[in-house]
Swiss-Prot record:
Belongs to the universal stress protein A family. SUPFAM superfamilies: Adenine nucleotide alpha hydrolases-like (SSF52402). It is found in: Cytoplasm. PANTHER family: STRESS RESPONSE PROTEIN NHAX (PTHR46268), UNIVERSAL STRESS PROTEIN UP12 (PTHR46268:SF6). Keywords: Cytoplasm. This is Putative universal stress protein SAOUHSC_01819. Gene3D superfamilies: HUPs. It comes from the Bacteria.
């Protein structure tokens, strides 16, 4: 039976990512594995926004830090013994599979599916697709065609996202 010891879970503040995070917590507990929770701020897309809002990157950083701290608390309270968080800047498509996976010696990367439609996915591609193509280890993409009606996010709440949108 395959066991995992270093699991990387990529989160972005979406409900799909939180759904995948919940699955990652379960896998980490079953394998008594270290769980590294990662958020990559795609700084390339923010440069144009900063013309309008000079504090946009700072807001994004604070949002990511609060998100990661919330996920760490949930994982720890759920019984994951070794939890680490990482905040990076750059392209998630490259940073996650080509840099972070090697740095933490990941043997499993988990991520959720994006909220992109077919046209957007064709034009820009998806982060999960890039991870699958470039990862040096196993990858589990947690699919959700539609989240269950009773799913309530604990961390990536509407209130948290709205707090950093203004």
């Amino acid at each position: 039976m395959i066991t995992y010891k270093n699991i990387l879970i990529a989160v972005d503040g979406s409900h799909e990512a939180e759904w995948a995070f919940n699955r990652a917590v379960g896998v980490a507990k079953r394998n008594d594995a270290k769980l590294t929770i990662v958020n990559v701020i795609d700084s390339r897309t923010y440069s144009s926004y900063e013309v309008y809002d000079a504090q946009f990157t700072e807001k994004s950083k604070h949002f990511a830090e609060e998100l990661l701290n919330g996920y760490k608390e949930v994982a720890t309270n759920a019984g994951v013994k070794d939890v680490e968080t990482r905040l990076e800047f750059g392209s998630p498509k490259s940073i996650i599979p080509k840099k972070l996976a090697h740095e933490i010696n990941a043997d499993l990367i988990m991520s959720g599916t994006s909220g992109l439609n077919a046209v957007e996915r064709f034009i820009v591609g998806s982060v999960s697709e890039s991870i699958v193509r470039h990862a040096p280890c196993d990858v589990l993409v947690v699919r959700t065609e539609e989240l269950p009606a009773d799913f309530q996010p604990q961390v990536a709440t509407t209130q948290l996202r709205e707090k950093y949108q203004n």
